């Protein structure tokens, strides 16, 4: 399949540079199968959820993963922590005029000292000195890594708004953005209606922003991310399916975690590990019936995922509609509700 099949024209002014003034006030495009497109607001989501449905949220927490400093040799350096390996060791992307060599010392803001001890592919392995953990050092001295299409520096407002209200476990370098729309009040309304909430963890990596650089998408190599599906979530999903209820994936990261855990048998099983699952049209979904998601970049792997879920023609029409009505796109943008359209590649 050609990458051009997933291209579309997006006016630059539709790329949201800031969150909405009030969390949860975004627009919601309801694009369910066999229904006309509907313009709603995100607070209307419970209208489409039935008692007994299960909504699966990604509880990852965005790290303040960006560090600025210099090498012992004096050159400037920027590190983006991709994955924390243990309390004092992490893998990082490095930007510098010259790549640091093994054994080279690095000094970051706040007096943080680290040594570059090796490499894993394109990533640099950093060993941090001192008694504080990597997470503690980042929380005190790091900067929130906003996506590259947000053309401004992170500010104090982003510290809360680029984080879901249910975030628990540090490890992500990008937010699971569909979850940014949910408020505590909306979660209460869903539970009051009889919906069941469940959680997975998928630590979103910087690879989520990597462009697809091949013409044939089958040749693309997907990045790897760590995920976990707890036994409680697997049980809640299986129970919902047994009673005929729907399973909602809140965001593409929740979807990738669920599908990764169900890939071996076709049924959701508890588990954890690394996943490089690449979902493209023709993929047969095993778990979710509904997907809550933001609007994605042209030619992106996430646009391929939603096209696989709801059908390429359906997504093209929905995106064309959203552009015409000036929905806001990407991380701080508006959201949509999609339904699974079995076996459709159009």
Swiss-Prot record:
InterPro entries: QueA, QueA_dom1, QueA_dom2, QueA_sf. One of its GO terms (cellular component) is cytoplasm. Its EC number is 2.4.99.17. Keywords: Cytoplasm, Queuosine biosynthesis, S-adenosyl-L-methionine, Transferase. HAMAP family: QueA. Monomer. This is S-adenosylmethionine:tRNA ribosyltransferase-isomerase. It comes from Neisseria meningitidis serogroup A / serotype 4A (strain DSM 15465 / Z2491). The lineage of its organism: Bacteria, Pseudomonadati, Pseudomonadota, Betaproteobacteria, Neisseriales.
């Amino acid at each position: 399949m050609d990458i051009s099949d997933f291209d579309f024209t997006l006016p630059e002014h539709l790329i949201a540079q800031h969150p909405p003034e009030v969390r949860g006030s975004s627009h919601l495009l309801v694009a369910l199968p066999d229904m006309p497109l509907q313009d709603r607001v995100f607070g209307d989501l419970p209208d489409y959820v039935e008692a007994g449905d299960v909504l699966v949220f990604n509880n990852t927490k965005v790290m303040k993963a960006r560090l600025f400093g210099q090498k012992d040799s004096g050159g400037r350096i920027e590190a983006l922590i991709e994955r924390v390996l243990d309390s004092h060791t992490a893998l990082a992307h490095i930007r510098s005029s010259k790549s640091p060599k093994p054994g080279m010392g690095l000094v970051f803001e706040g007096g943080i000292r680290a040594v570059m001890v090796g490499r894993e592919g394109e990533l640099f392995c950093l060993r941090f000195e001192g008694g504080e953990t990597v997470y503690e050092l980042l929380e005190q001295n790091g900067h929130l890594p906003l996506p590259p299409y947000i053309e401004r520096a992170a500010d104090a407002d982003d510290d809360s708004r680029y984080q879901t209200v249910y975030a628990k476990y540090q490890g992500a370098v990008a937010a699971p953005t569909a979850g940014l729309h949910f408020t505590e009040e909306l979660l209460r309304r869903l539970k009051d209606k009889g919906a069941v909430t469940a959680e997975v963890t998928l630590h979103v990596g910087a690879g989520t922003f990597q462009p697809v650089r091949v013409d044939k998408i089958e040749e693309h190599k997907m990045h790897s991310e760590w995920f976990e599906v707890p036994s409680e979530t697997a049980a809640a999903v299986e129970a919902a399916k047994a009673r005929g209820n729907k399973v909602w994936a809140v965001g593409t990261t929740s979807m990738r975690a669920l599908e990764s855990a169900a890939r071996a048998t076709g049924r959701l099983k508890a588990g954890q590990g690394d996943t490089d699952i690449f979902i493209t049209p023709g993929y047969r979904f095993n778990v979710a019936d509904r997907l809550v998601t933001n609007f994605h970049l042209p030619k992106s792997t996430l646009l391929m995922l939603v096209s696989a879920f709801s059908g390429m023609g359906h997504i093209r029409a929905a995106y064309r509609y959203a552009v015409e009505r000036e929905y806001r796109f990407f991380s701080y943008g508006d959201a949509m509700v999609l339904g699974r359209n079995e076996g459709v590649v159009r």
